[in-house]
Amino acid sequence: DNFKKASEMLKSAKRILISGHLSPDGDSLGSMIALSTLLNNAGYEAFAVADINALGKIGFLEGTKSLIPLRNLKRQKKFDLFIAVDCGAFDMMPPEVRPVAEKLPTICIDHHISNTGFGDVEIVDPYASSAGELVWRWAKWNEWKLDKVIAEALWVAMITDTGRFAYDSTSPRTFRAAGDILK
């Protein structure tokens, strides 16, 4: 089970870097924020990195305050684990992230059928509505608690990639995740 393998990788990690794709949309950004908050709440040191000048309409998310701006990535201490979210290929990540990520063990969390399989551990499900849904499933597997920041970020992730639950990617599991997030 890949949730188990990914959770095992976490056990030896001290500092975790999380990134999504270039020009993050709601799923990419929401998944990064939710996952970094979940991991920090669980006692890990997790840092999500993004181009904060390119957030546009989704910059309202409360969790954006904790993002590391891409321009500051080089000033960070070393990381020992990388997690890519909503990223179907390594070259879809920001160029600033790639030289750091390529040296690290990698977990890839993605829902694109075109995913190239670049992670050491893959949490990839092309039937999932969004990367946010997969982050939610991993959180449930680990029994991590959702707080307001996490719930808001996961909600934005899911409504972005489901077209507010209108696209074919929306499934009963998507609605179960959404219902859990709203609690």
Tell what function each PLM region has:
Residues I68-V121:
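Active-site cofactor/cluster-binding pocket
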Residues L17, F47, F82, T106-I107, ...:
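Hydrophobic "anchor" residues on beta-strands that sit immediately upstream
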